[in-house]
Amino acid sequence: MSAQCCAGQLACCCGSAGCSLCCDCCPRIRQSLSTRFMYALYFILVVVLCCIMMSTTVAHKMKEHIPFFEDMCKGIKAGDTCEKLVGYSAVYRVCFGMACFFFIFCLLTLKINNSKSCRAHIHNGFWFFKLLLLGAMCSGAFFIPDQDTFLNAWRYVGAVGGFLFIGIQLLLLVEFAHKWNKNWTAGTASNKLWYASLALVTLIMYSIATGGLVLMAVFYTQKDSCMENKILLGVNGGLCLLISLVAISPWVQNRQPHSGLLQSGVISCYVTYLTFSALSSKPAEVVLDEHGKNVTICVPDFGQDLYRDENLVTILGTSLLIGCILYSCLTSTTRSSSDALQGRYAAPELEIARCCFCFSPGGEDTEEQQPGKEGPRVIYDEKKGTVYIYSYFHFVFFLASLYVMMTVTNWFNHVRSAFHLLP
């Protein structure tokens, strides 16, 4: 790594310069993209920290392998075994700090139209100081007095914010599927194979949704019990069928010719994921069998211990959670997505069918693309106008912080933090 590149990265961490890829084999990166990537990286770090805090395994390993662990915990007043740094209440506090971080930047970046203002420089740079600020806010949340009142109030705020974020995800998925269907339909004028591609993808979407509902019916229900799970599966499955019929109804087709089964298929897959998340978060039911023994029902039985589905649920759920959140946060704030959500789409004749339709067919050259051979290579693409809405970007991450808090803690009351912890 050259000295010029090191100086550029130092300017990125401690100044207003944009982050770049230093390797010569790496392409230039746009400032608008690198900024969003850095905020997403901070977000992922906090999500991973929350998952660690919900892990009893990590707490036991730390106690076994860290010398003077109990003395250290008492020294920082975190309890005899640092119990204040793990569990539901710890996740609530860390997510409170992250939510405050993004909400402050939401207010700070209101009405920014280009990257020349001093507020835009703060948004696009000073990453080291922002990391310190994020860490300070997450740590400071542990010193909030009157824990019970704070956690009770914050739980309701988190529930409202989580539901709002789910709504944003649904709207974004509709826009995504509409763009997908519209782009591939445009290619049918020159190549009829695009019809086959649309049909294949639609079939895959409905197969995933149907297969998911069937598997959940097999593993999360039993013949004479689990009535709540059966009702949830029946209602959500019925709603997926309803939106599929509405999507191809004559009234919708007249108002929106590009509507079809692809959109409803994508939404059905997402509803299936939400149903899986709800069922996996629901506490297991324990009943007495005919021999008077406690039997756990309404959870997958893979033949090991009480919560034998936890590893599968946690890995799959966390992966889907991070993927959905990052896609929503990074794409819902672009101006093209905002226009599409308001019903303003590109003219059909301007559409060029592409497999990777999410990306523009070619980069937009700017005067900043200088053919330098080494050092930071950033394309400052927002001097004339921002690519995305800064304040809305931070607001979506604010809601995502609340959604993560509720999802990682299984939407439970913090008082029940000892009931069930992720492995």
From Swiss-Prot:
Instruction: List cellular component terms (GO).
Output: centrosome; cytosol; extracellular exosome; Golgi apparatus; intracellular membrane-bounded organelle; membrane; myelin sheath; perinuclear region of cytoplasm
Per the UniProt topology annotation, the Extracellular ranges are 1-36, 111-124, 178-198, 252-258, 333-385
Q: Which residues are exposed on the Cytoplasmic face of the membrane?
A: 58-89, 146-156, 220-230, 280-311, 407-423
KW Transmembrane helix (keyword) present: yes
Q: Which residues are glycosylated?
A: 113, 183
Q: Name one GO molecular function term.
A: L-serine transmembrane transporter activity
Q: What is this protein called?
A: Serine incorporator 5
Q: Which organism is it from?
A: Homo sapiens
Whichever gene encodes this chain, its name is: SERINC5
